[in-house]
Structures are given as C-alpha cells and as structure tokens.
C-alpha cells in the first residue's frame, strides 16, 4: 500500500495474531460492500485507521456505537467473512509530505500508481501491495538552514531545503506543526534518503528524530499563524474570467456545467497558465546558433521545427516538442583560452573556438569541483582553525528571486579544540558524495552572484560525439573504384597525410625519409588503392621526401599522365570536400563519421605534421596555417573526447628574410583517448601502444567568460519530458533546453507552452503549480471520498512553504456521489436526491481550508490555497443539490452554458449568470496597476446586459426599429462576444492572455463604443458610419492577434496606435 495507507502499514509488518495484545483486535460483525461493521472495538477513535481481515485491508472508522465500529474500507472487500480479525493502529489516515511529491501520480489515498505498476507488472492495484508514497531509494541533496545545535525550534520552522527538480528548486524541509524542542544534532549538507535521520530534537528530556518527510492526518487542516485577506488576483489567462469574474489567490471558485461544456479545458487552462507559482526556467539562443542534429548534420536554431530531432550528449536523438521565441537581454559565452595573448599585443589573435550567445534566463549547464581546504588564522589574538568547503546553497537575486547555487561555506573554531575536529569535518565532507564535482544549472544573468573562488572553479562541458554515421563508407560504396573492405581506413589515413603536408593541386605530400615504418605504410596503403607511390628527394628540408601517388591504370611504359587521373585519393579530396576553393579543409561530416575512421584520419594527420611528447602526460601538437583546417581539426578532436586548445602564432619575417604567415598550433591531450589514436600511427616517433583496458569517452570541461550584450531576439527549443533536457550545439557544447519541467502528470504538462510575465522589470516565465490526485476507475467509493482530503492536505503543505497553490477538484460531483453511496450503506436518512443531510457541512469543511495565510514558524512566509471545483450536475441543472451547496460556500461562480458550447463559443461562460464576490477586494490591486480596470469592467457588463434586453426587442420588432444608439450597443456587444469573450486555446496568440493585454483590449472595445456613440450623438448616421469605419472595427477585432510573447511594452504601443487611429478615423468620418 502507499501514502495514506502506508503510514499505518509500515507499523504493522505483515503481522500475525500473536504479535499484538488481544485488546487491540476486534472481529468483523457484518460486511456491506466497502462498509464493514466490527465488534469488540471499545477504545477505538473516530477516523482511526484499522487493518481488516487476514489480508490487512486498510480502512477508517467513521462511526462508533457501543463496542461496534463502522469502517469504510479503501480496498476491495471481496473474501472478507464474519469473525475475521480487525486490528486497531491507533493512528489516523495520513499522507506523507516531503521531497518527491511533485514527480509522482497518486490515487485518492496517496498510492504511487507508477511505482505500483512497476512492482506488480499489472494495470490494476493488487490487494495488500506495499509501496511507499515517497520513493525511499532516491538520495536528495540536503542543505541545512540557519538552525544550529543548541537552538530552539518549533512547529513549522524551516531547518533545511532540498533541490527537488528545476520546477521546485528549493523544497523547504519543515518541522511538523505539533513538534518543538532544542536541537541536539543536525545533519551536515549532503545526500540523504527519506528514511535517514536529518534532525534530532530534545523536549522535556525526550529525544525525537526527524527525516526529510513527515506525515499529517488528511482530515485535520494544517495550522497557520494567521489567516489573511486575499488581495491578489488568480490570473487564469482567460479574458472573460480575468476581466469580468476574477478570482483571488486563496479564493474558492465553482465551475458547474453539463457534459461537453468545457469544464476540464478551463481546469487544465488554470493548471497550465495561472499565476499560482512561476518556477519554470526558459533558456534560448541567438539567431544563427548552429545546433547538431540527430543525423550529424548542422542546422541553424531558427530553422529547426517541432518534431525535428537534435543530438543528445549520449549520441542519441532528442525530439523537439516546442519552439519558444521572444526578445530579451542576451549574453555572450566565450571559452577562456589557455594561451591568452597579452592585452597590449593587438597583432596576436586568440581563437575563441567555443562560444555561443544566449538569453538572460538561459540555464548554463555547469560543473564545480567539490572543494575542501583547511586554514589557520588569528582573530583578536586567538588562533582558529577554519575549514572552507563548496556546498549547494541559496542566494537572493537583486529582483528577489531565490537562486540555487554553489557557495563557499566556512566553519571555524578555536585551535584549542585540537586539529581532530577539523580533520573530522574534512573527512565527512569527502565522504558525503562519491562525485568529484557538483553538476548544476544557473541562469546566465545569475552568474554574477557567484563568489570569486566558486566562479573561478566553475566550468561548462563539451561532449564527445558518440553518434556514428557511415558517410565515408557510403562514399566508398558508390565510388567507381572497386576497393577492398579496408578502403575507408586506407583512404582516411592517406587523406590525413595529405591535409598535413600535401600540395593543394595534386595527390602529393611530403614524409620524413628517415622514418622507414611510415614510408612502408604509405607504400602498402597506396597498393591497396591500386596506386603507385613514387618518392623524390627534396632540397629543403633534406630529410624530407615527396611522395607522388598515381594510378597504375594510366601511367607507366613511358607515359606520364596527370597525377590526378583515375586516382581514388584525389577523387576523395575533391568529392568529399577536403579541398574547397583551392584551400585545404576538414569537412564537418567527419566529426560524426565512424569513430575508427575519425581516429585513422587524425593518426595520418599526426604522422604527417604532428609532434608527440610524453612529458607530463601524453600530448600531441599539430600546426597549420589554414583556419578551415584549424576549425575542422578542433571539432574532430573534440568529437573523439580529446582536450583541445589552440595558440595563434603571428605572421613574421625570419632572419633569412622569409615571410611566415600566421599559424595555429592545436594542442591535444586526453590520456587513453589519445593513446587509441596514436596506436593507429605508423611514424616511429608518433606510435604508442593502444590502452590495455577499455575506456570511456567523457565530457570535457572548459572555463568561460560571460559578457552582457544588448536586447535581441532569441530562439529556443524544448525537448520531450522523458529526456535529460540537454543537447549539443554544433561546437559540441552541452546546453540545456528551454522550458524545463519536473512533473510527470503528462496530460497536463505535455502541452505547457513557454509563457512570460513582467516581474520586477524582467521577463519571467509563468508556470502553474498543479495539485492532481487521480482516482483509478476500479477503486472503491470510500477511497474516492478520501481523495479530496488528500489533495487539500498536499496543497496546504506547499502553502506552508510559502507557495501559492491551486487545487482543482474535477469533479466534486463524483465526490458527493461517493458520500451518497456510503451514507446509503450506513442507513442514514437521505435528503434531496438521496444525498446525505450533512452534504453542505462536508463541502464547507473542505472549502474552508482554502485561503491566504502566514505559515507557522520562521522565517516568515505567506502562501495561499485556491480551490477551483468543477461540478457536473445531471443535465446541466444548476438547482442540483451539489451545485446549490457549493454556490452557497464559494465566492466565484463561472457558469458554463451548453448552448454556447454547442455554438463552439469557448470558454462557454454565460456572462448573465456568472458572478464574482472578489471584485471589491481586488480594487487595491487594480488601483495600483490598472486604475481604469473596474470602470471598464462595469461598462463592458453594462453593454452586454443592455444588448441582452435589446435582443428580445429585436425578436419582436426587428433591428431597423431600434435607434442608432441601441444598434451600436448591439454591434459592440457582438464584437465583445466574438473577439473578447471567445479565446482560441490552441493558438499561440490566444492560448494565454496576460492581464495587461486583457486591459488594453478592454480599452480598445470600450473606446470603439464611446467614439461611435459620440459620433451618433453629433448627428452621424450609424449605418453609413459603420461602413466608413469598417477598418477600425476590423482593427479592434484583430487586436486579439497581438502576440503576448512580443512583450508588454511593444504590444501596449500597438494598442496606443490603434486608439489614436480610432479617434482620427471617427473624427474624419463625422466632419
């Protein structure tokens, strides 16, 4: 079992009757579906958890009568018989609250459905399965808070935090509300599972241990310090709701509607777009950034489409599911060269080979080595030991955001305590993780928050290209030359020799005449290509020989043909792009070709033009004057997993007057990876034996600098949820995708587009935190009844962390039906339509748990729980008892109309029956942000209301009988209904409408109405005026097409233009 039921079950490990006192047992008296009556239950409490039968089915006491207790059982009761044992646990039905909640789908009693499926290999939940609600195997990175040993701590105090995922970057660890005491031990920063002790507290001489999670009874509201008045809107992104019937963060809302009216669409729209919690990180790149595609090709980021596949760092494809676009301050990321030119030496170039441009909120994938060092220092005459470590922590950004980053943490104490304490700290830090580094992400704009030592140590990575295509082999297959199976290897090696020291107009290159093994290799390989190798001595340098490779077919017997005729090597040089516009070039396809082919080509290049040394580890150096060879070689070496750096040597004239062009030295190292390349060399000074053991091609680090650029357009790609959200740019830098998500509720999250809101002057992505408890179809009704309490308890837990949470109950009618069934089995007196008389009280006890509150404990934090309940009355009848009871409690009513839904008018909100009681509460918010908002809202409601009355008149006497003023009211009302109240949820421009766009649209529609009424009042004829200002009406209607992604400032400018044009056009038309 899990969660709610696991909390009791873990106390009772498959027990036998002998394990407990006889007084703890009762016996089954009767069974009626999920309702079981047990006798001999004196001493049990209401809502106590019990174990029913030999299978330990979990149930809850819901009525006590003498020694008999009525129990609702949360599992199938088939097979229970009278006389079976019933064991009392002494605990209420509770849920587990801690890290891991947001990555699991639960059923109504907090059973993790995915974990149960994996354990049972069944799509059904077997009876008695024992799976904990929160995964006990995952290790969480715990960072202690400000509390230390000796401090007093009370319920709700935050004593640490955990990095759960990129969505919940700081999951606060709270002391359970009913606990308190003095801290006697707290765990240092490190990785812990949920079962490991984190905190030890002593109160009244009794010690208690606490872990990363705690349990809480679902039927008991979590206590708060103070309930506050909610005064901030719950922005849904739906114009009709945000403008006319707003809800607040911490409010209660009812959405009744018949089947097919769009309740679930509105609920999911809330899940996706509302402002309950905005913790999505979006990272994107500048136009022209080259991305490595899954097939090894290179594509500009702006040309990538949804469905394309990019390459991951493991060589496997990653599918693109979204393409975020926008405009933001950009940052240039540039590799720090190991061969930095002096600033005064302007003649010397420093090749910056790893670089890209990203937006401010792009997440850089970085690593920081774990570091611990010990110092001794004297403070006020006292000598201290100081242990300084790098640890994951938090820092507040200037705009108030909490940023998760690596920090330098210092601990010091008098030297009189001896060095043992310092050694102990150093040792515990080293043992805390088996990784040598922290792998984490940080937004580009936040890099300046890092301390100098951490910033200096932090680096990014580039990955080897593990993907292999057969471009080279396919070329050989299609070649007119019938070569042996060794053809690709032979050709790759000779191409390497030619790139290193060959002539750019023929298949000729130079070799060292003293290196007999190299000359033998050339002769052997030439033979395999059906070529002859002709050696000629060179004057300069004397030790070199020129090797001409020519075809046996067309040369000999006194005939001296062109060296390039019928020559497979020359054909490959030209055909594969090794010679471009008369200049040597290493084509990009080579970096994704077969790894053996890449290594052989590089071995040929090293044999021809390389230098190998064993000083301080194996290294190889190649020099070239061609930038195309330099860039291609760097890309090729990195694709194999080698460490590469480049040094530029400026152009010069030597003592003999010889001019030397600018040249580049490419330095390569990489241990076994490089040894494997050198094992394919033939040169006696270059060859090294292959590594004896297998080796892995790892990501390599590079240190980088960041420079802020001006604002510009950015282009992003979002990868599928089941990937690691990382892919490779064409230069093999490992980068993060846009729109990282941490939740597995696929039906809500798969379609999350990247959205932004303006917060503290910077663009922030919007993300709605969803609380979803999904009941399986074959669960007993008792579990369905409990599910609503499970959901609200989870919501309250996140509220206590200082978050704004929305709970969506879809549908509370199903919950009420479960109440009705249990009530019927208990034989209670039915009320209206068979529902129990206490339906209203039960609903109220649930809705009263919503609200904005100051959480218990320190530091001070404010959170809210908003409840949105979808109700499904039979036939759309709003007089249904569940709807009536809900309307009596909730403050906002979004009534859905089946007729509107049938006309495909979505959201199908009936404006004449819907209402919100929060409009006055929100006036303070509107006054400080959009002062005209309440007036515009009232005007819009007035127009719609007047139009409804006029429509009845029109049905009697026709539209022509109306005055021009009334005709304007009707026409503008139609415009509002079609272009303001309706929204296309499947478009980029209308899926989410920010409050600022809603406000500007209201101004535009009301201004159009006022200008028209003013013109008619001045004597204009409306039918003629409507024709002459048709373009203005079209512009007002089209204002919904303004893309919110362009930003508030730009879109507001468009509306200002529209308003000034409107005034001019009406003025012209009435003159």
From Swiss-Prot:
Pfam families, alphabetized: ATP-synt_ab, ATP-synt_ab_N, ATP-synt_ab_Xtn, ATP-synt_VA_C, Hom_end, Hom_end_hint
State where ATP binds. Answer: 257-264
Kindly state a single biological-process term from the GO annotations of this entry: ATP metabolic process
Modified positions (N-acetylalanine) are 2
Task: Report membrane topology.
Answer: Peripheral membrane protein
Phenotype upon changing residue 737 to S: Inhibits splicing
Any extra detail in the entry?
Answer: Present with 199895 molecules/cell in log phase SD medium.
- Describe the protein's quaternary organization and the partners it interacts with: V-ATPase is a heteromultimeric enzyme composed of a peripheral catalytic V1 complex (components A to H) attached to an integral membrane V0 proton pore complex (components: a, c, c', c'', d, e, f and VOA1). Interacts with RAV1 and RAV2 components of the RAVE complex, which are essential for the stability and assembly of V-ATPase.
Q: What is this protein called?
A: V-type proton ATPase catalytic subunit A
Organism (species): Saccharomyces cerevisiae (strain ATCC 204508 / S288c) (Baker's yeast)
């Amino acid at each position: 079992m899990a969660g709610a039921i696991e909390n009791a079950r873990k106390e009772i490990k498959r027990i036998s009757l002998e394990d407990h006192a006889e007084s703890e047992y009762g016996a089954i008296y009767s069974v009626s579906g999920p309702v079981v009556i047990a006798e001999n239950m004196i001493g049990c409490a209401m809502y106590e958890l019990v174990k029913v039968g030999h299978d330990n089915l979990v149930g809850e006491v819901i009525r006590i009568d003498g020694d008999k207790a009525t129990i609702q059982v949360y599992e199938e009761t088939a097979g229970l018989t009278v006389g079976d044992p019933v064991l009392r646990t002494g605990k209420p039905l509770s849920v587990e609250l801690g890290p891991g909640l947001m990555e699991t789908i639960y059923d109504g009693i907090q059973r993790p459905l995915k974990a149960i499926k994996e354990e049972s290999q069944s799509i059904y939940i077997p009876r008695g399965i024992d799976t904990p609600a929160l995964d006990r195997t995952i290790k969480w990175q715990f960072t202690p808070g400000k509390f230390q040993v000796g401090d007093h701590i009370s319920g709700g105090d935050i004593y640490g935090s955990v990095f759960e995922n990129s969505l919940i970057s700081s999951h606060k660890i709270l002391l359970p509300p009913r606990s308190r005491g003095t801290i006697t031990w707290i765990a240092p920063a490190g990785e812990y599972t949920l079962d490991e002790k984190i905190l030890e507290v002593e109160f009244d001489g009794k010690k208690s241990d606490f872990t990363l999670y705690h349990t809480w009874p679902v039927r008991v509201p979590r206590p708060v310090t103070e309930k506050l008045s909610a005064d901030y809107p719950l922005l849904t992104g739906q114009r009709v709701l945000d403008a006319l019937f707003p809800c607040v963060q911490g409010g209660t809302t009812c959405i009744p509607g018949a089947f097919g009216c769009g309740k679930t669409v509105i609920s999911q729209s809330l899940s996706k777009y509302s402002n309950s919690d905005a913790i999505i990180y979006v990272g994107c790149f500048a136009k022209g950034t080259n991305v490595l595609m899954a097939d090894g090709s290179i594509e500009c980021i702006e040309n990538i489409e949804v469905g394309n596949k990019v390459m991951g760092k493991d060589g496997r494809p990653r599918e693109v599911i979204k393409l975020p676009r926008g405009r933001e301050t950009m940052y240039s990321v540039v590799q720090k060269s190991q061969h930095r030119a002096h600033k005064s030496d302007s003649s010397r170039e420093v090749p910056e080979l790893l670089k890209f441009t990203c937006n401010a909120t792009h997440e850089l994938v970085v690593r920081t080595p774990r570091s611990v060092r010990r110092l001794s220092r004297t403070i006020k005459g006292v000598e201290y030991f100081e242990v300084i470590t790098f640890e994951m922590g938090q820092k507040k950004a200037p705009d108030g955001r909490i940023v998760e980053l690596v920090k330098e943490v210092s601990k010091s104490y008098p030297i009189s305590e001896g060095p043992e304490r310092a050694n102990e700290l150093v040792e515990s830090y080293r043992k805390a993780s088996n990784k040598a580094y922290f792998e984490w992400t940080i937004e580009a704009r936040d890099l300046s928050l890092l301390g100098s030592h951490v910033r200096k140590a932090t680096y990014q990575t580039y990955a080897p290209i593990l993907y292999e295509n057969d471009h080279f082999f396919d070329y050989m297959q299609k070649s007119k030359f019938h070569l042996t199976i060794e053809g690709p290897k032979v050709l790759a090696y000779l191409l390497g020799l030619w790139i290193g020291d060959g002539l750019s107009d023929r298949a000729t290159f130079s070799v060292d005449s003293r290196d007999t093994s190299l000359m033998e290799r050339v002769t052997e390989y030439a033979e395999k290509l059906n070529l002859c190798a002709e050696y000629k001595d060179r004057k300069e340098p004397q030790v070199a020989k020129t090797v001409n490779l020519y075809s046996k077919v067309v040369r000999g017997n006194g005939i001296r043909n062109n060296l390039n005729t019928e020559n497979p090597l020359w054909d490959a040089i030209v055909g594969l792009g090794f010679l471009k516009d008369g200049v040597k070039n290493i084509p990009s396809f080579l970096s994704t070709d077969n790894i053996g082919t890449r290594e052989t080509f590089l071995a040929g290049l090293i044999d021809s033009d390389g230098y190998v040394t064993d000083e301080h580890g194996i290294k190889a150096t190649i020099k070239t004057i061609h930038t195309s060879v330099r860039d291609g070689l760097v890309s090729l070496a990195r694709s194999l997993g080698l460490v590469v750096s480049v040094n530029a040597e400026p152009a010069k004239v030597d003592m003999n007057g010889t001019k030397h062009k600018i040249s580049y030295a490419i330095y390569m190292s990489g241990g076994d990876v490089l040894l494997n390349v050198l094992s394919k060399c033939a040169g006696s000074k270059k060859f090294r034996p292959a590594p004896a053991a297998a080796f892995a091609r790892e990501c390599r680090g590079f240190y980088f600098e960041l420079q802020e650029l001006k604002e510009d357009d950015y282009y992003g790609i979002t990868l599928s949820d089941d990937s690691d959200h990382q892919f490779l740019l064409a230069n093999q830098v490992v980068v993060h995708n846009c729109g990282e998500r941490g939740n597995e509720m696929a039906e809500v999250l798969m379609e999350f587009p990247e959205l932004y809101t303006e917060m503290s002057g910077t663009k922030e992505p919007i993300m709605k935190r969803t609380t979803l408890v999904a009941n399986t179809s074959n669960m007993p009704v008792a579990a369905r009844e409990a599910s609503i309490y499970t959901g609200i308890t989870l919501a309250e837990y996140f509220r206590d962390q200082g978050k704004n949470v929305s709970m969506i109950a879809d549908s509370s009618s199903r919950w009420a039906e479960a109440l009705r069934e249990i009530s019927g089995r208990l034989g209670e007196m039915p009320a209206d339509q068979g529902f129990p008389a206490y339906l209203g009280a039960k609903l109220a006890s649930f809705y009263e748990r919503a609200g904005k509150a100051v959480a218990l404990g320190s530091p001070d934090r404010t959170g809210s729980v908003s409840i949105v309940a979808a109700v499904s009355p039979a036939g759309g009848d709003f007089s249904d008892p569940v709807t009536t009871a809900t309307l009596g409690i909730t403050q906002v009513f979004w009534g859905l109309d089946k007729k509107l839904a049938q006309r495909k008018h979505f959201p199908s909100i009936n404006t004449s029956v819907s209402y919100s009681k929060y409009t006055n509460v929100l006036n303070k918010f509107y006054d400080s942000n959009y002062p005209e908002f309440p007036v515009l809202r009232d005007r819009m409601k007035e127009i719609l209301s007047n139009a409804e009355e006029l429509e009845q008149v029109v049905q009697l006497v026709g539209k022509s009988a109306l005055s021009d003023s009334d005709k304007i009211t009707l026409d503008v009302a139609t415009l509002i209904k079609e272009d303001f109240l309706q929204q296309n949820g499947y478009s980029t421009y209308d899926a989410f409408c920010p409050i600022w766009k809603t406000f500007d649209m209201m101004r535009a529609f009301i201004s159009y109405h006022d200008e028209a009424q003013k013109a008619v009042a001045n004597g204009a004829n409306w039918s003629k005026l409507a024709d002459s200002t048709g373009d203005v009406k079209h512009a007002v209607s089209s204002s919904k097409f303004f893309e919110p992604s362009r930003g508030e400032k730009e879109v507001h400018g468009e509306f200002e233009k529209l308003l000034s044009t409107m005034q001019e056009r009406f003025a012209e038309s009435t003159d």
